[in-house]
């Protein structure tokens, strides 16, 4: 079905200007207002010039478009405003834009951006021409008039108004300055108050509309445009004009109100099959479509109430963060085309506009107060350096005072107390007390000058160190007690077998007297403890002390000669067997966690043991660990010794 009927003329009513007080009394929530503008039908170059429009307006708020699934049906859309193909630039400005400008004078933000497919008339809506100026020149002109009228009002006698402008474009995900082109990608930042700003961007002060024209017209020519099959002057970037209004109080308390107006001309989405883009144009089109897709994701996330809004996924949405779901009074002008060839582009734009009008912003006034008498705030690093230097001066002064105590004390005595009349012992105690108080005062002053967070961290660290010291003291007492008990038992055993030791020593020394000392070879004897008899060994076993025997071992060299004897430690047989039984029981019944409690058994070996046990059954002895892959006999031997020694020491 083709809509060929003439579009209805919409009735345009003048918008009532609301005072700043009434604006301030309004609710803090403001929905994004969406207006749709239909571009006039452009005649085709074919012989058949009968208009074949796919969309038409119903009234000043609604329109209908053919349903592509069933051309006998139409789909209707309702918006805050609809402007037909005969609507003028002034009607659009007065109907949708001018009512948000008074918010700037009370420190609130506002934004106007044009959205739509390529060739739908977005740039014409925002810029216009000398005969029909668009939204940008009309808004700037009226804003200048409003500030002049507000400055001349009696209630604003002590207030001044300053208007500055900056103009940037987002070209292939790079923020470029248009007022002073530098071929440099400018960063986008967010301050502590969640305000979006562009450090390093050029700011120009404008006092009249002539100043604005002087800066804006050359900057607009710096914007990247190119010719495609659908548009002779297609914008290849998103243009963002920022107008900042600063209201400053000249008397105490020196308040400042800052309002920002964003005027944004978005680049249109493109179908490269129709535009015929190649090379650099194809790359530009990809960047444009990607940023517009991110914009649609932001709108969907806001409507669904998702916890994360993907503002940072593109430079465009990062700049529009305040306009969509932020703190600005926002107006979106959706431009559409009536031709059948633009049907799907128009349908997509209308669906996006319908989703955008559900977004709720929360505007608020940005007010700051400046105190003239207040000194300039130091940077944290400078403040730290100043604090350090002052502490060093205090320390040097204290050191010089301590180096000459007599002179300082004499002057103090003359000023406060006559020390000559006091006893020397009393004077000495007073001097010591004064020194202690001075040191304590210095420590408290340093603690008070420390920031709260750092001070709390220091106190917490001090408490932890005190607890650690107490724990170490308790452990030291336990170790000392065990050492004393072991020493007592050892002394008792030595005293009881002193006679047996002397007899044994004489017995071993007697044969040596009859030998020729000139031919005897000196041998090394290792004595860990005095030699004990069987009774001493039995008493030691009863007391539970493990006993190790020293075994003499000779090493044989390659030529058959014996080296000097070395010593090897052998463990008591009963302890060795009981330890092996305990290990064997754990190997046959233990879980992975229990096996890992053994010395030199990790997660991998514990799983190997359980796997071998499931396949081959229980271990018959500990030495069967050699059957496991990667475990040698030497490792099994060291494993047994380590676990038995560990059980004895524990």
From Swiss-Prot:
Q: Which domain of life is it from?
A: Eukaryota
Modification after translation? Ubiquitinated, leading to its subsequent proteasomal degradation.
- Localization annotation: Nucleus; Cytoplasm, Cytoskeleton
- Renumbered ranges of motif Important for regulated proteolytic degradation: 560-563
Binding residues annotated for ATP, in chain numbering: 116-123
Enumerate composition-biased segments (Low complexity).
401-411
Question: What is any one GO biological process for this UniProt entry?
Answer: microtubule-based movement
Pfam families according to UniProt = HHH_3 (PF12836), Kinesin (PF00225)
Cite the GO molecular-function annotations of the record.
Answer: ATP binding; ATP hydrolysis activity; DNA binding; microtubule binding; microtubule motor activity
Question: Coiled coil: which residue ranges?
Answer: 452-498
Keywords noted in UniProt? ATP-binding, Coiled coil, Cytoplasm, Cytoskeleton, DNA-binding, Microtubule, Motor protein, Nucleotide-binding, Nucleus, Ubl conjugation
Q: Give me the Gene Ontology terms describing cellular component.
A: cytoplasm; kinesin complex; microtubule; nucleus
Major subcellular location class: nucleus
Residues in Kinesin motor domain copies: 31-359
Which InterPro entries does this entry report, sorted A to Z? Kinesin-like_fam, Kinesin_motor_CS, Kinesin_motor_dom, Kinesin_motor_dom_sf, P-loop_NTPase, RuvA_2-like
User: What is the annotated role of this protein in its UniProt record?
Assistant: Kinesin family member that is involved in spindle formation and the movements of chromosomes during mitosis and meiosis. Binds to microtubules and to DNA.
The similarity comment for this entry is:
Belongs to the TRAFAC class myosin-kinesin ATPase superfamily. Kinesin family.
Q: What is this protein called?
A: Kinesin-like protein KIF22-B
Query: From which source organism is this entry?
Result: Xenopus laevis (African clawed frog)
């Amino acid at each position: 079905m083709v809509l060929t009927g003439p579009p209805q003329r919409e009735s345009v009513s003048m918008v009532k200007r609301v005072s700043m007080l009434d604006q301030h009394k309004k609710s803090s929530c403001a929905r994004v207002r969406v207006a749709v503008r239909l571009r006039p039908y452009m005649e085709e170059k074919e012989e058949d010039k009968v208009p074949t429009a796919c969309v038409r307006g119903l009234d000043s708020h609604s329109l209908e478009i053919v349903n592509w699934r069933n051309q006998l049906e139409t789909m209707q859309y309702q918006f805050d405003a609809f402007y037909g193909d005969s609507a003028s630039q002034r009607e659009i400005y007065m109907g949708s834009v001018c009512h948000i400008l008074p918010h700037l004078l009370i420190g609130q933000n506002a934004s106007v951006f044009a959205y739509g497919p390529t060739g739908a008339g977005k740039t014409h809506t925002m810029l216009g021409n000398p005969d029909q100026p668009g939204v940008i020149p009309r808004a700037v002109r009226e804003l200048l008039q409003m500030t002049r009228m507000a400055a001349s009002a009696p209630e604003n006698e002590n207030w001044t108004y300053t208007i500055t402008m900056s103009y940037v474009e987002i070209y292939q995900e790079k923020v470029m300055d248009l007022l002073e082109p530098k071929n440099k990608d400018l960063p986008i930042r967010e301050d502590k108050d969640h305000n979006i700003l562009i450090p390093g961007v050029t700011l120009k002060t404008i006092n009249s509309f002539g100043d604005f024209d002087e800066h804006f017209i050359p900057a607009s020519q710096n914007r990247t445009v190119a010719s495609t099959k659908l548009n002779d002057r297609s914008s290849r970037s998103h243009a963002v004009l920022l107008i900042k209004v600063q209201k400053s109080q000249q008397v105490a308390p020196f308040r400042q109100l800052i309002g920002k107006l964003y005027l944004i001309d978005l680049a249109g989405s493109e179908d490269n099959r129709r535009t015929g883009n190649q090379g650099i144009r194809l790359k530009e089109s990809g960047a444009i479509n990607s940023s517009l897709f991110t914009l649609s994701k932001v709108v969907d996330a806001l409507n669904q109430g998702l916890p994360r809004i993907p503002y940072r996924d593109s430079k465009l949405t990062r700049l529009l963060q305040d306009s969509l779901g932020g703190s600005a009074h926002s107006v979106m002008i959706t431009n559409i085309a009536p031709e059948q060839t633009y049907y799907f582009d128009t349908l997509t734009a209308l669906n996006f506009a319908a989703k955008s009008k559900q977004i709720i912003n929360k505007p608020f006034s940005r007010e700051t107060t400046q105190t003239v008498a207040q000194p300039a705030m130091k940077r944290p690093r400078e403040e730290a350096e100043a604090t350090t230097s002052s502490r060093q001066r205090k320390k040097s002064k204290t050191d010089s005072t301590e180096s000459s105590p007599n002179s300082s004390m004499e002057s103090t005595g003359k000023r406060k107390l006559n020390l000559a009349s006091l006893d020397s012992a009393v004077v000495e105690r007073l001097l010591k007390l004064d020194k202690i108080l001075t040191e304590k005062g210095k420590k408290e002053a340093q603690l008070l000058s420390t920031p709260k967070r750092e001070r709390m961290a220091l106190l917490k660290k001090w408490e932890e160190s005190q607890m650690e010291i107490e724990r170490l003291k308790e452990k030291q007492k336990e170790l000392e007690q065990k050492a004393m008990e072991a020493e007592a038992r050892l002394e008792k055993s030595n005293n009881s077998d002193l006679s047996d030791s002397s007899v044994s020593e004489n017995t071993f020394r007697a044969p040596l007297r009859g030998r020729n000392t000139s031919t005897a070879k000196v041998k090394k004897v290792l004595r860990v403890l005095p030699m004990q008899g069987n009774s001493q060994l039995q008493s030691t076993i009863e007391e539970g002390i493990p006993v190790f025997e020293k075994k003499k071992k000779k090493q044989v060299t390659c030529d058959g000669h014996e080296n000097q004897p070395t010593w090897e430690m052998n463990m008591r047989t009963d302890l060795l067997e009981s330890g092996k039984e305990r290990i064997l029981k754990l190997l046959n019944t233990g879980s992975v966690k229990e096996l890992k409690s053994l010395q030199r058994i990790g997660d991998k070996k514990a799983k190997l043991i359980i796997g071998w046990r499931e396949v081959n059954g229980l271990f018959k002895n500990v030495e069967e660990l050699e059957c496991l892959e990667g475990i040698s006999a030497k490792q099994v031997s060291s494993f047994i010794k380590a676990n038995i020694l560990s059980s004895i020491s524990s």
